[in-house]
Amino acid sequence: MSNPLNPSGNGILKLSDGNIMLYPYGEDQIVTVDNGGDKLKINAFDISSKDNPKLLYSQELGGSNISSSVFENPQAFMFDTEKNIFVLPVTIKSEEDGSVTFNGAYIYSIYMDEGFERLGAFSTEGNIETIFKKKGKLYCVTNRGISQGTFAEPDKMVGVKFIK
């Protein structure tokens, strides 16, 4: 958005039949998280032509057994366009009995000339409320506590639990 204090509409962009979250990436690209068709996908679009958006990259993360809380809580998604990294909260359930097998987040890099690359993942206790970075560190706040780690070693997050 070239002028965030004075936004203006540029038209209607039809990208999916499901729920979709849009994240601007420069002037003419967007990254989307899409749960249409019982699948969770991340996509990158060139929207320089508003009437003809071009899908640049798409990655399916899983079927109906994987979900993301970004549709209910957009603050759970962290996107650092300067470092070309985003963090997406995910929950994976067993297809057999519906029990949660993974609750946490995936970390991706994105480059418009190369696509997406999953850099790692970290698990959390509780539902992710927000993810942010400060001074090169990655922080994740859930309804049960706060964790801190690095983008290079997300599986080594350490945290403290909130006391009730």
Give the ranges of each region predicted by the language model.
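Feature marking well-ordered beta-strand scaffolds used for ligand recognition
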Residues: 1-164
